[in-house]
Structures are given as C-alpha cells and as structure tokens.
UniProtKB/Swiss-Prot annotation:
Role: Catalyzes the transfer of a ribosyl phosphate group from 5-phosphoribose 1-diphosphate to orotate, leading to the formation of orotidine monophosphate (OMP).
Record family assignment: Belongs to the purine/pyrimidine phosphoribosyltransferase family. PyrE subfamily.
EC number: 2.4.2.10
Residues annotated for orotate binding in this entry: 119, 147
First-level EC class: transferase
Protein name in UniProt: Orotate phosphoribosyltransferase
Cofactor(s) listed: Mg(2+)
C-alpha cells in the first residue's frame, strides 16, 4: 500500500482541500465538511499520492474517462501511471469545432470512470450515459472520496461498481480526532 487512508485525509487537510464547517454542495445538500479535490490537485505531491491511491483500487479496463472539470487532473496523471488511454467527458457538446462531447475514443471499449468526489452519483451517471451513447461500456467507477450519500447505490442500479480511496467515515474520523487533539 502506497499510503494509508488517514495520511491521505491529513494531506487534504494540510493543503486546505478538506474543510469542516457548514457548506452547500453542488447537489444542493448541506454538509458539515467540504472536499475540494481540484484544490488538492494543484499540489504535485498530493496529486501524486491521490493518483497512486486510485491506482491501487483501479479495476481492469481499456480506457480511463472522467467528467470535466474535477476529474481532468486525476484522469490525466492516472492515465500516464496506468499506461492506459484517457477520455474527458464534457458537460455538454461543444457548439463549435468538432461538436463532440467526449475527447478520446471510447467506442467498443471497456471504460473505467474516474472522478474526484461522489455524492449522489449525478455527474458519474451523466458521464456514463455519454460514454454509452458513444458505444463505450462502463462497469466500474473510481473516486477519491465517496461521500456515502447514494452514489454507490445509484451506480449499482446501472450495473456499475463504485470504488473509492476515502469515504465520508474516514473524513469524519479525522475531524473527530482533530477535535479531540484540540481538547
């Protein structure tokens, strides 16, 4: 194992990518913590550690694909480390140029979805639909953090297994340890 879960969570906290407080998520839900993997990815050592950890849980596949914006640095570095081609799934088709929604070739390939954080699974499901429309097959998804708020179940209903490096329980455990240490 490259690095334990607790140390990864500590690294996120150290670079300001893990915050505790009162936050509104993109899903509209409120949360007592916020994970900003995009911020974490701006720190080379953290990006390296996160992608090493993702590599450990990465299932077999032909192509790695992730939705813009959060997955782009992760899928890029992971592609190099795994020696696999990558694809980026845009939120919507471009209105100019080629007009494509997916950058990279997924047609007829087994695609592993990669993302930063999974809450309800909405962005992963949107990426899944785009990949399937282009003729790709998705059976697995990997994320840095599973917030344990329905993504695993939503993906399972579509025949996709979700693996994560960290969970909400891991992050709350760190928060509780920090609170205890401060007394």
């Amino acid at each position: 194992m490259v690095m334990n879960r607790e140390r990864l969570a500590e690294m996120l906290l150290e670079v300001g990518a893990l915050k505790f407080g009162d936050f509104v998520l993109s899903s509209g839900k409120r949360s007592d913590y916020y994970v900003d993997i995009k911020e974490a990815c701006t720190h080379p050592k953290v990006l390296d550690a996160l992608t090493d950890a993702l590599l450990e849980v990465l299932p077999d596949g032909d192509v790695l694909a992730g939705p813009e914006l959060g997955a782009v640095p992760l899928v890029s570095v992971l592609s190099v480390k795994a020696g696999l081609p990558m694809a980026i799934v845009r939120k919507r088709k471009k209105e100019y140029g080629t007009g494509e929604r997916i950058v990279g070739d997924v047609r007829g390939r087994k695609v592993v979805l990669v993302d930063d954080v999974a809450t309800t699974g909405g962005s992963l499901l949107e990426a899944l639909e785009a990949i399937e429309e282009e003729g790709g097959e998705v059976r697995d998804a990997v994320v840095v953090v599973d917030r344990q708020e329905g993504a695993e179940e939503a993906l399972k209903e579509r025949g996709v297994r979700l693996s994560s490096v960290l969970t909400a329980d891991d992050l709350r455990g760190l928060r509780d340890a920090e609170s205890t240490a401060r007394g």
